[in-house]
Amino acid sequence: MRADLSNKNRIVVKIGTSSLIYPNGAINLAGIDELAFVLAALQNQGKEIILVSSGAIGVGMNKLNLKERPVEIPQQQAVAAVGQSELMTIYNQRFQSYSQQTAQILLTRDIIEFPQSRQNVSNTLEQLLTMGIIPIINENDTVAVDELDHLTKFGDNDQLSAIVAQLTKAELLIMLSDIDGFYSANPLNDPEAVLYSEINEITPELLEQATGKGSPYGTGGMTSKLKAAKRILDLNSHMLLANGKQPKIIFDLLAGEPVGTHFYQRTEDEQ
């Protein structure tokens, strides 16, 4: 049994596109509804919940009946614009069925790096949380492009969720993906791969495991999650990585059930 994290009050939940979109491109409405139920329930328990959600391009492709992801950046941004609107419509419908208000916040890296706009974002988030509203955050894909000396992209929402956790002084980041946690090797290729129950330090060896030959996590996958975990560990906070196929797993994670991977720094008493 892991440490009980049910006392954590301010929680950032990040959900990836793979948990929102089926492999055939259909939107996972049942999964989104379950996520809304869980987060609304936690909010009703007095917790402060922030959702970082991917999925704009995936939902946009579904809405526009596209079978393949666009290659050109302007096309990707147009699809993201359609998808973000539709995604928020779905979220609003699902959360409203549980009497929970939500708000949309779209961010770019330069907003966070500029002190004045960073403070404005922080103020807005604090006010929404005070009002009992769940902020739903995504990168602003329609304008986020890195070119020359103007850097606006976070890289991916793994990094964004860790930055949001840092900005809001969250006590816990829960990252839901299409994997059960961090493994000692690629579980698709190695039947001996072992799931880490907890990780207390992001070492070069761990990063090598994430990017090693045969790993399915090379680009914006497990490496990105480990970098996000390092940011959380540096803050002496907690991060949980688990499979988002059934969002009710969040209840198990908070209760200390041995699912997923728990990233945290051990105290001197625990070492």
Spans of features found by a protein language model:
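C-terminal catalytic "cap/lid" subdomain
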Residues: 1-101, 105-271
